[in-house]
């Protein structure tokens, strides 16, 4: 990556998420501490401040089918101070924003939306249901379902579909059994969402080791996703597994320091893994495959002393980007 472009300067930036809405690709970014939230347009470089934020932003996502509606999780402050956290609805009218707390959800951390048959299902995960102090992990988190099509946006109702995952931290979109789905992770492993014939949602086990974050990508071109993990919680190890049909076989392992912000994608048509270190070198790093069977990868530093919290690999037009929320430098950055 030859070019670094600082697109936003945000104190204690935590969230940085790129997504397409209609013809445009946007980046939503926000602070872990301050009431600073912005929407950045890739094609024009235009920045719009999303007003009404209390700070403590963990996630910012678009609502499919509505180009002017977005959902976020805010109110979770370091270190896991989140009794007032919740889901927020952001509506855009021309250049103005209207933000409302849609659901009080203590210790909310991650959210994603699945669209099935034209209906939007919002899933929100909490790291815990209650914490006496930041080190208290005695209570598992919850996974909540909100059917957005059944709401007016004024008052949401949620249904708990799981309350068994301790240190419920990771969430990512992927495809399993031919369907787009969401995976969540924690001490008990990785689980994915499945909808039965009656329309009910449940979680199913995919991997049975403690995982902080995960991403899925076809590294060797055989048409099957490999599993890339940070282990354990906020862990010290990056692992890559291949699914042999009966088990996940580890093919590569390397050290991290407070691993965070794991993502994967393609740069110049080649698979790449991107991950941050939130202690030690604080480096933003990439891993490129040389030989998966032999467990050989090229590890490179994208930027030292960045302290990344979230990263993403994506393409816009003819350009491949790495997006990173470099909290150490208070910057949301594009590399290309």
What residue ranges belong to the model's regions?
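Beta-propeller-forming repeat regions
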Residues: 1-336
């Amino acid at each position: 990556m030859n070019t670094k472009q600082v697109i936003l300067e945000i104190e204690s930036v935590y969230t940085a998420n790129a997504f397409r809405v209609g013809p445009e690709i946007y980046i939503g970014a926000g602070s872990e501490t301050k009431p600073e939230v912005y929407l950045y347009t890739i094609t024009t470089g235009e920045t719009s401040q999303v007003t009404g934020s209390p700070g403590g932003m963990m996630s910012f996502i678009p609502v499919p089918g509505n180009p002017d509606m977005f959902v976020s999780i805010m109110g979770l402050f370091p270190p896991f101070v989140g009794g007032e956290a919740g889901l927020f609805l952001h509506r855009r009218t021309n250049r103005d924003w209207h933000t409302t707390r849609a659901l009080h959800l203590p210790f909310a951390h991650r959210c994603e939306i699945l669209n099935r048959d034209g209906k939007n299902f919002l899933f929100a995960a909490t790291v815990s249901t209650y914490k006496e102090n930041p080190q208290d992990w005695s209570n598992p988190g919850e996974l909540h379902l909100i059917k957005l099509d059944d709401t007016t946006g004024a008052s949401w109702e949620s249904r708990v579909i799981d309350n068994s995952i301790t240190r419920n931290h990771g969430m990512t979109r992927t495809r399993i059994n031919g369907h787009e789905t969401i995976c969540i992770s924690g001490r008990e492993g990785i689980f994915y969402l499945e909808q039965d014939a009656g329309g009910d949602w449940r979680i199913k086990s995919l991997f049975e080791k403690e995982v902080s974050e995960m991403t899925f990508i076809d590294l060797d071109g055989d048409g099957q996703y490999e599993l890339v993990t940070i282990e354990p919680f906020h862990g010290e190890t990056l692992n890559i597994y291949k699914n042999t049909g009966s088990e996940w076989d580890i093919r590569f392992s390397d050290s991290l320091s407070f691993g965070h912000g794991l993502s994967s994608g393609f740069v110049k048509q080649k698979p790449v893994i991107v991950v941050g270190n939130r202690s030690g070198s604080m480096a933003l790093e990439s891993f490129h495959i040389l030989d998966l069977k032999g467990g050989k990868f090229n590890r490179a530093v994208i930027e030292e002393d960045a302290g990344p919290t979230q990263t993403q690999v994506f393409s816009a037009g003819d350009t491949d980007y790495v997006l990173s929320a470099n909290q150490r430098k208070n910057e949301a950055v594009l590399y290309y």
